[in-house]
């Protein structure tokens, strides 16, 4: 049986990753760049990169195609655009970028370190109403809080 990080690692052989400072440069130099945020809507509403498109990981593949309830026309038309996929920590985005490549997206990358790294690089985030998010609030939000029942039981 594979574990989550093994699956991510295997996809990395085919997926290009960029660092937060690279995304900052790409956003400044390519106004056509599409940032896809594959986190859940409640995560996106809390904070995201301004102008990014929320396409939750669970509907990504159907959102990339015509004739589905989840179809997102901007995403379907983006197969030849530069696309950067983001998530919280850079793992879900690798899986999503891999799927998008299989679906014919030619210039897709994953944000290594995810929005945590974006925040650590002190780049701006906005909330669901597009208001600036305080970086201290973002720091608190991105601090992992595992419940006891989420921890691996002792052997």
Model-assigned labels for residue ranges:
Residues 86:
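Short, surface-exposed ligand- or partner-binding patches at beta-edge/loop junctions that are enriched
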Residues 1-33, 41-82, 91-155:
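Rhodanese-like catalytic fold shared by cysteine-dependent sulfurtransferases
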């Amino acid at each position: 049986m594979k574990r989550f990080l093994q699956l991510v690692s295997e996809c990395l052989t085919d997926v290009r990753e960029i660092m937060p400072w690279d995304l900052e440069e790409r956003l400044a130099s390519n106004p056509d760049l599409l940032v896809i945020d594959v986190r859940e809507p409640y995560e996106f509403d809390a904070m995201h990169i301004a102008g990014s498109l929320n396409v939750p990981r669970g509907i990504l593949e159907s959102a990339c195609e015509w004739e589905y309830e989840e179809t997102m026309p901007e995403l379907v038309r983006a197969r030849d655009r530069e696309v950067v996929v983001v998530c919280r920590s850079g793992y879900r985005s690798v899986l999503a970028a891999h799927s998008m490549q299989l679906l014919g997206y030619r210039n897709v990358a994953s944000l290594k370190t995810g929005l945590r790294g974006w925040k650590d690089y002190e780049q701006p985030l906005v909330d669901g109403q597009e208001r600036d998010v305080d970086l201290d609030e973002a720091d608190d939000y991105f601090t992992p809080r595992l419940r006891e029942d989420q921890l691996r039981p002792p052997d």
